[in-house]
Amino acid sequence: MTDLQHNLFLLTFDDKLGNAPPNDKDAKVGRVLDVGTGTGIWCVDFGDEHPEAEILGVDLSATFPEFTPPNVRFEVDDIEEPWTYSRKFDYIHSRMMNGCINDWEVYAKKCYNNLNPGGWVEFIETPLKPQSDDGTLPADSQVLKIAELIQEASEKGGHPTLPVENFKDLLSRAGFVDIKVLKYKWPTNTWPKDQLYKEIGAWSHENIVSGWDALSLAILTRAHGWTREEVVVSNALCRKEFKDKSIHAYWPMYSIYGRKPEKADSEDSE
């Protein structure tokens, strides 16, 4: 999670860090887990907003900030391994993890089992492929082609992408109740007429363009045998599409959250 992307989420969510009730300004929150914390900026912001909370951010790589609020700490951890936290949480925040999880059913149940009764989980996810509502994104789009190849490589590597439309049922099967689904749009550039979406599009464009080259180079050369030169040509075509304001494309961004019942059923082992 980059700081740029974090600020894009703040703009999308009307300056809130998430949509589940623990993100309300006056909410009194206990223990919080941020999965895939990246630079840790979400944890730092949440810790500043909720000084009464105890926040733990976990990630596979240690790119954590040097200075943090006293109620925030970080750990290098692999969430695919059994969870061994000594105490349960009141809010689990999981953002942009699609393509990073081996088994979403297992992951959702781990979240359930590691929440206190009445605790909340929130998954914030988007599909890799953009879409359009007016047919201006051509079926032979280079961006769609590369997104499909990246998705194939992720699945071959044991990290399948779950369709965002399936997350509500995923939480329900895990035992969560009061599930809400909120849908937003991240335009590929400043094509929208609406001023807010135009601003979101500007940030969204910078977010995808800044990371596209590295993402596509690693996956296309390793998983699909492309040459570096082929990737460079492809990326130029993708950047051209990302900039094209006649293509009214966007990524649907979903916030799905649910509550663990106050009287939860007996829990499985991790």
Q: What kind of feature is each model-predicted range?
A:
Residues 120-213:
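Conserved catalytic/acceptor-binding region of the Class I
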Residues 14-22, 40-43, 59-62, 76-80, ...:
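Eukaryotic intrinsically disordered and solvent-exposed regulatory patches
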Residues 174-270:
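C-terminal lobe and adjacent flexible extensions of AdoMet/dcAdoMet transferase-like proteins
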Residues 105-120:
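A short glycine-rich, Lys/Arg-flanked "PGG" loop and its adjoining helix->strand segment in the class I
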Residues 1-31, 41, 45:
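Conserved alpha-helix/loop element of class I SAM-dependent methyltransferases that forms part
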Residues 94-98, 124:
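Residues lining the SAM
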Residues 26-87, 91, 106:
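Class I SAM-dependent methyltransferase SAM/SAH-binding core
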